[in-house]
């Protein structure tokens, strides 16, 4: 079958912004109106980003006092309304937050206990027990919009599932919800005694975890009242970020540290054709559903959703129409399962001083995108001062393997490392950020021959081995990393292809090396379904990296984004030291669950203790002239020597 080829190159963002303005209906922005940077040197507009923590209730006072230039956490609705129109302050508005309830569906292990949320009909009844209109209009004072599925009204895929959303029949109907709950509880053997459910003579008690920092405290109170009216005994705890996440996401659901939690998700990029959110919020294979794919934990399982999710994620469809049908099927199944009860999309207001120039807001995340603070500056200052609700908490972990799972750390990390590809701030289509790429595909029905000198990482021999004769792939993406490799790391050493190659080998090892997979189970089991589609790699004479994948999409840029194998987040030497610390010395872990299971620290490079461990390991590896065996013998190329 004849394939197609497309070349994508990075465009200066000021130019792309101007072009976007020229193309949008009613837009007046012209190319010469794009903000002029304060200098003509390479790199970001400002010299430094200075981060500091400002509690959300005090943030309006602090930004009025010019203690910061930008607050990267959405203000409470009333505070935003009071601040709007204040001289010297601008509000950057975006539908950047989605709120939901996650239910614990694990069955009770003891015969004299009952978890109501292990019963599907009770989870479904929760859809009618929550008052989304009250949350959107009263709690968020009109700044929220009711949301029934993982797709909010501002998302492009809302049109894909519009009829499912509007035809679901879900509305606030507490009498119906209580009747459905009563029917299911009675069938399970529970009794209603003095308007309270009992099972085996004991009250049916639910543990509700509510976040205390924002409007989710009010949501928790609202949900508690509805649950109590339905006959449940509710024990509510109000936790801040770290304590809540530890209780919910780092424990076995069967331990019942929680039954229901008020989730909140921030968004950092629009998605024209979503694959990540629909899988993360619905399908258990990706590790974001109760059980979190951690070894030894009870797991929520759903083979149908996993099969649909992997099909969508791996591009195993032949048209836009087929893709949309899979997406719709997953959305409908998520409503049937009702593990997450979606509540609202919230318009956040991010205040900034009006002297902050050059900043870009995308359509869903506002200033939470990689262009915003790279382009932002305050005239006459080398610094941009960024405030957030938190900069560090007990659950904030700086490591690129199993950390950066919270918005606060991710907000910093986004400006410490350049992505190769990122979704366009306006269209939601992947575009080059710091790597150019060329896509060639024979999909959806054909295949390409993988060259005989292409290689794949072999976990058993710890070497790059030639791919077997006759290996084929659906698509080929050729990456030009010269915008990275023509520059240095912050410590002055050159960025090289060895940094990317180490990342590729490391990822495969984490997934398939039996001992490493035993230690970091969640990382291993969630990455294998994707790694299975990567067929081989080849370095060209001009240092481009060819990646061969069994993946197709009707939009070539999505093929490019899928095939991006590793990127350049930190020098390979640091990654090697971390691997040694985690897998050889066993003195740290990449993920929270592994750290808990093996009673070692969850590795975070901003903590003096952990940074010291990595530093000492680096020095030891340097003394021994250590080079990871086999990793840098790539085809007929030696990318690193001990010297």
Protein language model regions, located:
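N-terminal lobe/hinge region of extracytoplasmic solute-binding protein
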Residues: 388-472
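Surface-exposed, Gly/Pro/Thr- and Asp/Glu-enriched linker/hinge segments
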Residues: 31-47, 85, 116, 195-200, ...
């Amino acid at each position: 079958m004849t394939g197609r080829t497309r070349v994508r190159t990075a465009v200066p963002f000021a130019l792309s912004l101007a072009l976007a303005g020229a193309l949008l209906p009613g837009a007046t922005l012209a190319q010469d109106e794009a903000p002029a940077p304060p200098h003509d040197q390479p790199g970001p507009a400002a010299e430094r980003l200075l981060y500091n923590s400002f509690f959300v209730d005090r943030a309006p006072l602090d930004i009025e006092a010019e203690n910061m230039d930008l607050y990267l956490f959405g203000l409470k609705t009333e505070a935003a309304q009071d601040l709007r129109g204040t001289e010297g302050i601008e509000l950057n508005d975006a539908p950047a937050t989605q709120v939901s309830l996650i239910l614990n569906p694990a069955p009770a292990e003891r015969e004299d206990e009952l978890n109501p949320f292990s019963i599907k009909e009770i989870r479904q009844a929760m859809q009618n027990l929550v008052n989304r209109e009250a949350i959107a209009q009263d709690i968020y004072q009109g700044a929220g919009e009711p949301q029934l599925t993982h797709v909010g009204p501002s998302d492009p895929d809302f049109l894909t599932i519009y009829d499912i959303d509007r035809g679901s029949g879900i509305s606030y109907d507490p009498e119906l919800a209580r009747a459905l709950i009563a029917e299911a509880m009675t069938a399970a053997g529970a009794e209603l005694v003095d308007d309270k459910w009992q099972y085996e003579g004991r009250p049916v008690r639910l543990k509700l975890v509510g976040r205390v920092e924002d409007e989710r405290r009010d949501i928790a109170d609202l949900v508690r009242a509805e649950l109590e009216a339905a006959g449940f005994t509710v024990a509510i705890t109000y936790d801040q970020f770290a304590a809540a996440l530890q209780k919910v996401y780092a424990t076995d659901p069967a331990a019942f540290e929680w039954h229901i939690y008020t989730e909140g998700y921030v968004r950092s990029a629009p998605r024209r054709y979503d694959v990540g959110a629909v899988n993360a919020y619905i399908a258990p294979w990706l590790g974001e559903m109760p059980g979190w794919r951690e070894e030894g934990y009870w797991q929520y399982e759903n083979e149908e959703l996993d099969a649909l999710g992997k099909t969508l994620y791996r591009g195993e469809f032949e048209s836009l129409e087929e893709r949309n049908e899979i997406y719709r099927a997953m959305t409908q199944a998520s409503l049937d399962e009702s593990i997450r009860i979606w509540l609202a999309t919230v318009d956040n207001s991010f205040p900034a001083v009006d002297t902050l120039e050059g900043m870009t807001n995308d359509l869903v995340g506002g200033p939470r995108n990689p262009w915003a603070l790279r382009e932002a500056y305050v005239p006459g200052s080398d610094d941009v001062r960024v405030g957030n609700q938190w900069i560090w908490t007990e659950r904030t972990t700086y490591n690129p393997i199993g950390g950066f799972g919270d918005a606060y750390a991710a907000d910093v990390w986004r400006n410490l490392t350049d992505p190769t590809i990122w979704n366009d701030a306006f269209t939601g289509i992947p575009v080059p950020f710091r790597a150019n790429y060329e896509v060639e595909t024979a999909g959806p029905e054909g295949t390409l021959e993988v060259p005989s000198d292409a290689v794949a990482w072999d976990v058993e021999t710890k070497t790059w081995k030639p791919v077997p004769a006759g290996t084929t792939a659906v698509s080929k993406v050729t990456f030009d990393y010269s915008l990275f490799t023509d520059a240095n790391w912050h410590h002055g050493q050159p960025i090289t292809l060895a940094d990317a190659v180490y990342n590729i080998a490391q990822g495969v090892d984490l997934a398939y090396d039996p001992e490493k997979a035993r230690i970091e189970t969640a990382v291993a089991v969630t990455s294998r379904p994707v790694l299975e589609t990567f067929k081989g790699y080849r370095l060209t004479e001009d240092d481009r990296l060819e990646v061969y994948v069994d993946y197709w999409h009707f939009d070539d840029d999505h093929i490019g984004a899928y095939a991006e194998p590793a990127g350049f987040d930190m020098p390979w030497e640091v990654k090697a030291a971390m691997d040694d610390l985690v897998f050889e010395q066993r003195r740290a872990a990449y993920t929270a669950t592994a750290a808990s299971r093996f009673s070692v620290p969850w590795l975070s490079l901003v903590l003096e203790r952990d940074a010291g461990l990595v530093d000492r390991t680096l020095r030891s590896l340097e003394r021994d002239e250590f080079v990871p065996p086999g990793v840098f013998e790539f085809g007929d190329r030696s990318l690193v020597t001990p010297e």
